């Protein structure tokens, strides 16, 4: 159950987002400098618009506004709501923030080996097996882990939970890089918090493949299949979808 205090904080974020977007809502399409070029191209699709679009310049302005709304939701709104719900924060282990973390050469080598085998199709994602290879303490030299951040980071008693929030349509080449970052991130957090259980996930705000009449529902297996290479690099247990 979400507390009243958290409900009020979420409501405030919604009001802020609405206020900012109301101020930028298109009123005059003539100010859209790109409209003449877009309009010329869109005329080629006029037979597909039918009666749904009567004002192409305004349609272009509205599309630009919607793109800005998508950016706002993806870059800040979902993240802020996640922080409120979990009492978490954004955490960046980079040279410019909390500093890069160290992992052992063995941990780094094991992470690279996991990635190579997944990329070549030699193995399939297996969270238990992968964790056993990176959650280790050994005497090999320490090296820098890849700089990484977690859009949502919180200490939940006996465990550290990190979640990288992504758009629901990630780029086709993202999955390998995200997996590499998460593997080294988990290895680094394991060394930094040796008495904690470490969890690191990819998180998504909703399932775009689900019935729009049931906006809080999801089908994780179907969603993962819709994302290029997600099943190649991630186990189902590594993915979180808001509901």
Spans of features found by a protein language model:
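Nuclease-adjacent, charged terminal/linker segments that flank catalytic cores
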Residues: 1-102
């Amino acid at each position: 159950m979400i507390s009243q205090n958290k409900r009020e904080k979420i409501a405030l974020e919604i009001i802020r987002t609405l206020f900012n977007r109301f101020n930028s809502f298109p009123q005059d399409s003539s100010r859209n400098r790109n409209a003449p070029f877009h309009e010329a191209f869109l005329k080629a699709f006029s037979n597909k618009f039918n009666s749904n679009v009567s004002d192409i310049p305004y349609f272009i302005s509205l599309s630009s506004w919607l793109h800005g709304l998508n950016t706002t939701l993806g870059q800040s709104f979902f993240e802020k709501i996640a922080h409120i719900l979990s009492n978490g924060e954004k955490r960046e282990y980079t040279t410019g923030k909390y500093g890069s973390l160290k992992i052992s050469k063995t941990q780094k080598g094991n992470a690279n080996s996991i990635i190579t085998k997944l990329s070549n199709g030699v193995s399939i994602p297996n969270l238990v097996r992968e964790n056993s290879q990176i959650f280790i303490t050994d005497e090999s030299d320490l090296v820098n882990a890849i700089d990484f951040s977690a859009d949502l980071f919180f200490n939940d008693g006996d465990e550290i939970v990190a979640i990288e929030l992504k758009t629901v349509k990630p780029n086709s080449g993202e999955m390998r890089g995200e997996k590499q970052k998460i593997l080294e991130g988990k290895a680094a957090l394991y060394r930094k918090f040796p008495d904690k259980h470490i969890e690191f996930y990819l998180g998504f705000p909703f399932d775009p493949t689900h019935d729009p009449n049931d906006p809080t529902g999801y089908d994780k297996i179907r969603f993962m299949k819709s994302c290029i290479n997600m099943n190649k690099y991630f186990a189902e247990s590594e993915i979180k979808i808001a509901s």
